Amino acid sequence: MPEKLALQAADWRGLRAALVLGMGMAVLAGLGVLGACASSPEAAAVAAGDLLTPSDEPAARKRARIRLELALAYFEQGQTTVALDELKLALQADPVYAPAHNLRGLIYLRLKDFSVADESFRKALVLNPRDANVRHNLAWLLCQQQRWPESFERFEQVLSDPGYTEQAKTFRALGLCQARAGMSDQAERNLLKSHEYDPANPVTQFNLAALLHARGDLPRAQWHVRRLNNSELANAESFWLGVKVERGLDNRVAMEQLSLQLVKRFPLSRESDSLQRGAFNE
């Protein structure tokens, strides 16, 4: 996962499960919120070669778009119920607005109502079959349901789309899904591909480090988790992983430094509690 609808680097609590919204204007563009909506009949009727302008946007679509922007803002802030209220108004204004059905799917995915999420993503695809971001989201939903073969196949279909430009997001989600399915070799391969496209992404860095730590490849795990912990995106989870990696390498100085940062910056965290109890293998 994230914006377009993708994984978000600024809020990565729950690193092992990540389909989050991306940020700002890119999110709105990915939803089809910005500018005229080329999928609407009115927009399609504009003469070939003409520039689509705000005047081409039907009134109902404009109302739906504004409501969708509000819903998205609330969703990103974690106000899921308020986001759903705004989204309902968007769909009342324009029931065939594909981006609204996509966001509806994400909302119900967050609420773990998988049947409604599935219905919403599939409705969005009926309205706009070429939207790779919706196909990505549906693949992630299937992953949450542990429908591994279907999920992997849909991720691969997204990645095979020649016009798709969010490879980092989808390789990351595919790798996370494969890790959940116990396919560590494939997971590592796809997380590394994601890392090639987006080397600073904290979700990728953490999960690569965690995967390598679990299989005993401590030097490579150290390389990834150190990069993360030296960035402003470090958190309790990454510090704790760093502590365990350095402990495995018998690097006492680095282990102490990370331990101090963990306790100082995140004193009430579960990871800080585990450290103080010496629960390194939980």
Annotate each language-model stretch with its function:
Residues 59, 93, 127, 161-163, ...:
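Structural marker of alpha-solenoid helical repeat scaffolds
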Residues 43-55, 230-282:
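Terminal, low-structured helical/coil segments at or just beyond the last alpha-helical repeat
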Residues 37-88, 92, 276-282:
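N-terminal leader/linker segments that initiate helical-solenoid repeat arrays
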Residues 100, 134, 168-170, 204, ...:
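TPR alpha-solenoid repeat register
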Residues 63, 97, 131, 165-167, ...:
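Residue-level recognition of tetratricopeptide repeat
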